[in-house]
UniProtKB/Swiss-Prot annotation:
Source organism per UniProt: Alcanivorax borkumensis (strain ATCC 700651 / DSM 11573 / NCIMB 13689 / SK2)
The protein, known as: Peptide chain release factor 1
Gene giving rise to this polypeptide: prfA
Compartment list: Cytoplasm
Similarity remark: Belongs to the prokaryotic/mitochondrial release factor family.
Keyword annotations from UniProtKB, A to Z: Cytoplasm, Methylation, Protein biosynthesis
GO cellular component: cytoplasm
C-alpha cells in the first residue's frame, strides 16, 4: 500500500476514535445539529476504518507467518508458508477495497432524486415504453424500501406517459440511480401491430439529485414567473374546482417545472421549487462532469442525456447496456425492477475509471 494512502487511513482511524468520544459527550448529545453532523461523519468513515483494521490484522498475521518460516521445525515452516500466502491474499483484497472506499465521494450520493421519464421517438409506443420504464423504477424503489411521490404526469393517449416526473425518497437513492440518465431504446412488436413487425421506440430518463444542502443554488424571486391552473386527472371533484396546480418558469434559463399532484397550491409550489432547484443544480453539475468525462474518455457517469445507454429487446429477451458492453438475457426480471446486477456493474466500471484517473496523477 502507498505510504500516502496509509497516512490518510491513519488520520481517519484517529478521527474515528475522536468522533466516538464526542458522540458520548453529554454537551454534544444535547446539541441536535452538532450530534447529527458528527453522527453522519461517523457513519461515513465507519466502513473505511473497519476495513483498515482488517487490513492491519492481515499485515500482522503476515509478519507472524513469515517469522514461522524461520523455525527449525519443517512442519512449522510449511504452516508458516501457507499462512503467509493466506495473509498476503487478504492484504491484497483489502488494499483494493480500501482504494475504492477512499475514492472521492460525490456529495450528491446520499440525496433523494427527481426521476423524469420522457417519451421520445415512436409515438404511442414510446409513451407506453415510458410507462414501462417508470413502473420498472417504481418496483426497484419498492424493493429497496424507497418512497415514490408523483410530481407531474402527462398521460399518453393509449397508455403510459408522454412525460412523468416523480420524487424518489430513501437512503442513497442518487448513488444507485445516477447512471440511469440517458436515452433508453425498446425493440418489440407493439400490441397495435397486426403484421408482427418489430418497432423501435425511445425514451429519455433524467435522474436529478434533490438540491437541498448540495450547493449554493441561488434562485431570485424576480427571476421567476409563477402561474397557477386547475389540475387535471385523478383527485375527484375538489381538484377541478381549485387552481391548485403550479407552473414555475425560471426566466434566465427558460427551465419550466410544474406540480399538480397535491391538492394544496402551497404544497405544489414547494415541490415545484424543489424540482426547479434540482434541475438547475443538475445542469450545473452535468456541465462539469461532461468536461471531466471528456478528458477521461469515460462514458459511465458523463450524464449526457442524448447518449443511447441501453436497449431492451423483447423478442430476444435481452437487455444491453452500451456503455459497458453488458448484455443480460433477463429482460423480464429487469423490467420487473431487478436492476441490481446492471447498476452494480455500472458502479464497478465508474470506480475503475476513477482509480485509473487517480493513477494518472
Amino acid at each position: 500500500m502507498k505510504a500516502s494512502l496509509q497516512g490518510k487511513l491513519d488520520k481517519l482511524a484517529d478521527r474515528f476514535e475522536e468522533l466516538a468520544g464526542l458522540l458520548s459527550d453529554p454537551d454534544v448529545i444535547s446539541n441536535q445539529n452538532q450530534f447529527r453532523d458528527l453522527s453522519r461523519e461517523y457513519a461515513e468513515i465507519d466502513p473505511v476504518v473497519k476495513c483498515y483494521r482488517q487490513y492491519q490484522q492481515a499485515v500482522e498475521d503476515h509478519g507472524a507467518a513469515k517469522a514461522m518460516q524461520d523455525d527449525s521445525d519443517a512442519d512449522m515452516r510449511e504452516m508458516g508458508a501457507e499462512e503467509a500466502r493466506d495473509a498476503q491474499e487478504r492484504m491484497e483484497a483489502l488494499a483494493a477495497e480500501l482504494q475504492k472506499l477512499m475514492l472521492p465521494k460525490d456529495p450528491r450520493d446520499g440525496a433523494n432524486v427527481f426521476l423524469e421519464v420522457r417519451a421520445g421517438t415512436g409515438g404511442d409506443e414510446a409513451a407506453i415504453f415510458a410507462g414501462d420504464l417508470f413502473r420498472m423504477y417504481s418496483k426497484y424503489a419498492d424493493q429497496r424500501g424507497w418512497k415514490v411521490e408523483m410530481v407531474s404526469a402527462s398521460e399518453g393517449e393509449h397508455g403510459g406517459y408522454k412525460e412523468v416526473i416523480a420524487r424518489v425518497i430513501g437512503d442513497g437513492v442518487y448513488s444507485r440511480m445516477k447512471f440511469e440518465s440517458g436515452a433508453h431504446r425498446v425493440q418489440r412488436v407493439p400490441a397495435t401491430e397486426s403484421q408482427g413487425r418489430i418497432h423501435t421506440s425511445a425514451c429519455t430518463v433524467a435522474i436529478m439529485a434533490e438540491a437541498e444542502d448540495l450547493g449554493d443554488i441561488k434562485i431570485r424571486t424576480e427571476d421567476l414567473r409563477i402561474d397557477t391552473y386547475r389540475s387535471s386527472g385523478a383527485g375527484g371533484q375538489h381538484v377541478n374546482t381549485t387552481d391548485s396546480a403550479v407552473r414555475i418558469t425560471h426566466l434566465p434559463t427558460g427551465v419550466v417545472v410544474e406540480c399538480q399532484d397535491e391538492r394544496s397550491q402551497h404544497k405544489n409550489k414547494a415541490r415545484a421549487m424543489s424540482l426547479l432547484s434540482a434541475k438547475l443544480y443538475d445542469a450545473q453539475q452535468n456541465a462539469a462532469h461532461a468536461e471531466q468525462a471528456a478528458e477521461r474518455k469515460s462514458l459511465v457517469g458523463s450524464g449526457d442525456r442524448s447518449e443511447r445507454i441501453r436497449t431492451y429487446n423483447y423478442p430476444q429477451g435481452r437487455v444491453t447496456d452500451h456503455r459497458i458492453n453488458l448484455t443480460l438475457y433477463r429482460l423480464n426480471e429487469i423490467v420487473e425492477g431487478d436492476l441490481d446486477e446492471i447498476l452494480g456493474a455500472l458502479l464497478a466500471e465508474y470506480q475503475a475509471d476513477q482509480l485509473a484517473a487517480l493513477g494518472e496523477h
